[in-house]
């Protein structure tokens, strides 16, 4: 017989009755019934009820053990009586009568309960992550993650991609987030950087003559935490393709993403539908207008409409809106069907919500009995109300909510209002995954803080119209061959057709204020490669963590990462980041210049 187990704790069934077996695992629960002690023994695979009676010499030993102690039991499988069957467990029709018992590891008092789903607080859970990971939900989430990655690999290979590993130690680059820097001991004053993404390396692979690359790539960014973003590191399905258009990239990755979500869409116990591919494509400008976001949740049926022209009419006397419009502002509205009978408190609550975001409120008109009602209805005459109905599709029984501001802030608040209203009314469908592509991103944006034009997103994107567009168009009108894939309001991936021609790259960076010398200093390796024959290429990088988060229906990405950092980018279990000995700093030629501690009061 094996030293530790003949079966797992999730394996035994009625047909095993009469067998002598050996199991090993953690004590999940103990129940003392006087002459009998019941133990729920747990391993990765499940639970088995074990029974030990007072005649067993090990009874006292087990009685003194705490939950989470690790034991090995040997005993006989017996069928449970009808009244003691537990059909909630796969092993619930049998139990093991313990004959022998060995303590492998006695546990101290545990700081959090593994056998309970009660929230212990994130700080405690992360400090004792190894205990937290013993819980059934966490075990299932991590196995889901493993299975998703295995499925991704299989599907990418079936699509003709080859997996390569790119360097972890590289050069710092001026991408979006801060780099994590690693001092180079043999090169005083110089640093490696952990890659924010394998961006340059995967492009160099295309220049090297490889046609379709992918990897499950670790990425490192020194950025703040969010519910859908873990600080420090994350993993993405990084891929790149040669001699492709944007359509080719979409056609390659859509079956992979769709297949993953179809395969695992029933993970939570409720099978969700997955939008078919080809996925809907929405231009960036349209997304910002209709949804107030470049990450629209298409499960939400509400749509934003621009009604600036209605409030610009001479017969509309609402000066609060007119004054903003005269200064270049816009009016956006959201039609909400069937809420005319809602009490005044519904509208007041939404106004309070908007004020909490720093807005003056949400104006609204309720349509009933052929007329508009509400605080601003008296300023909008019948003809203008008819124009509002036509623009929004509103009918009696509906309400329309208004946001008025400069275009950027108006789009943002309208998008937030769209989500808030749909959430309050429970309009967002929970039974499906809705995918879309956001395309035609602006190549550049105006940086108000620095008073200059800069790249809007990825500086390596090919501008639509190529060199001619860069030389003849207003930079703020140029679109890029850049795209995001979005699911249920979560950005899964950014990608682009790359700028592989040096003359176009020099001009693109010049417009953003970078001299040729700057470009060569930062991206010299890639530029020199492009000057020696580079194919047109493009790719993307869907986030593994975010895909698993959606499939597991978890609101926080840390629920699908084994050992995540907390919101302050600390590893509470391993006590990282930590200080290092002075001699280590000396050999790295570093001196600390720490901020002075703040004086209280």
Curated annotation (Swiss-Prot):
Record has Transport as a keyword: no
E.C. numbers: 6.1.1.23
Start and end residues of each stretch annotated as Aspartate: 199-202
Pfam families tied to this protein: GAD, tRNA-synt_2, tRNA_anti-codon
Sites annotated Important for tRNA non-discrimination: 33
Entry keyword set: Aminoacyl-tRNA synthetase, ATP-binding, Cytoplasm, Ligase, Nucleotide-binding, Protein biosynthesis
A GO CC term attached to the entry: cytoplasm
Top-tier EC class: ligase
Keyword check for Protein biosynthesis: yes
Purpose: Aspartyl-tRNA synthetase with relaxed tRNA specificity since it is able to aspartylate not only its cognate tRNA(Asp) but also tRNA(Asn). Reaction proceeds in two steps: L-aspartate is first activated by ATP to form Asp-AMP and then transferred to the acceptor end of tRNA(Asp/Asn).
Description of how the protein assembles with itself and partners: Homodimer.
Entries under NCBIfam families matching the protein: aspS_bact, PRK00476.1
Name by which UniProt lists this protein: Aspartate--tRNA(Asp/Asn) ligase
Organism whose genome encodes this protein: Rhodospirillum centenum (strain ATCC 51521 / SW)
């Amino acid at each position: 017989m094996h030293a530790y187990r003949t079966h797992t704790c999730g394996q035994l069934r009625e047909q095993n009755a009469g067998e002598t077996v050996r199991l090993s695992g953690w004590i999940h629960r103990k129940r003392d019934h006087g002459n009998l002690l019941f133990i729920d023994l747990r391993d990765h695979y499940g639970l088995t009820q074990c029974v030990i009676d007072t005649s067993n010499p090990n009874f006292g030993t087990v009685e003194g053990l705490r939950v989470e102690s690790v034991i090995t039991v040997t005993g006989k499988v017996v069928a449970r009586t009808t009244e003691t069957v537990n059909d909630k467990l796969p092993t619930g029709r049998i139990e093991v009568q313990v004959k022998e018992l060995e303590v492998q590891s006695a546990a101290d008092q545990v700081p959090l309960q593994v056998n309970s789903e009660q929230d212990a607080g994130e700080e405690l859970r992360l400090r004792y992550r190894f205990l937290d990971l013993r819980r059934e939900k966490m075990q299932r989430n991590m196995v889901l993650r493993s299975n998703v990655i295995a499925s991704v690999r299989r599907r990418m290979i079936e699509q003709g991609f080859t997996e390569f590993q790119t360097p972890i130690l590289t050069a710092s680059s001026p991408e979006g987030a801060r780099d994590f820097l690693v001092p180079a001991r043999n090169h005083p004053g110089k640093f490696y950087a952990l890659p924010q993404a394998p961006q340059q390396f995967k492009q160099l692979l295309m220049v090297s003559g490889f046609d379709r690359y992918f990897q499950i790539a670790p990425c490192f960014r020194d950025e703040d935490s969010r519910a859908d973003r873990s600080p420090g590191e994350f993993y993405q399905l990084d891929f790149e393709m040669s001699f492709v258009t944007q359509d080719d990239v979409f056609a390659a990755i859509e079956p992979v993403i769709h297949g993953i979500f179809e395969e695992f869409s029933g993970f939570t116990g409720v099978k969700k539908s997955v939008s078919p591919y080809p996925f809907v494509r929405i231009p960036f400008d349209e997304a910002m207008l209709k949804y107030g976001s470049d990450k629209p949740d298409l499960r939400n049926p509400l749509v934003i409409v621009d009604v600036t022209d209605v409030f610009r009419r001479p017969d509309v006397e609402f000066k609060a809106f007119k004054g903003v419009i005269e200064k270049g502002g816009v009016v956006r509205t959201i039609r909400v069907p069937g809420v005319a009978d809602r009490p005044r408190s519904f509208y007041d609550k939404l106004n309070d919500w908007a004020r909490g975001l720093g807005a003056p409120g949400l104006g609204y008109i309720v349509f009933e009995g052929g007329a508009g009602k509400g605080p601003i209805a008296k300023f909008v005459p019948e003809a203008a109300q008819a124009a509002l109905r036509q623009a929004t599709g509103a009918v009696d029984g509906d309400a329309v909510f208004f946001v008025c501001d400069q275009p950027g802030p108006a789009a943002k608040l309208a998008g937030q209002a769209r989500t808030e209203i749909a959430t309050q009314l429970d309009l967002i469908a929970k039974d499906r995954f809705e995918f879309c592509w956001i395309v035609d991103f602006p190549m550049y944006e105006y940086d108000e803080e620095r008073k200059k034009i800069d790249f809007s997103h990825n500086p390596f994107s090919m501008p639509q119209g190529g060199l001619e567009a860069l030389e003849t168009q207003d930079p703020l009108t140029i679109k890029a061959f850049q795209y995001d894939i979005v699911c249920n309001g979560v950005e899964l991936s950014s990608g682009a057709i790359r700028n592989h021609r040096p003359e176009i790259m020099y001009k693109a960076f010049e417009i953003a204020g970078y001299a040729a010398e700057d470009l060569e200093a930062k991206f010299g390796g890639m530029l020199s490669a492009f000057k020696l024959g580079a194919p047109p290429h493009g790719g993307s990088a869907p986030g593994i963590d975010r895909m698993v988060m959606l499939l597991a229906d978890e609101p926080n990405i840390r629920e699908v990462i084994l050992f995540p950092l907390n919101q302050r980018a600390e590893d509470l279990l391993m006590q990282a980041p930590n200080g290092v000995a002075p001699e280590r700093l000396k050999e790295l030629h570093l001196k600390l210049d720490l901020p002075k501690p703040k004086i209280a009061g």
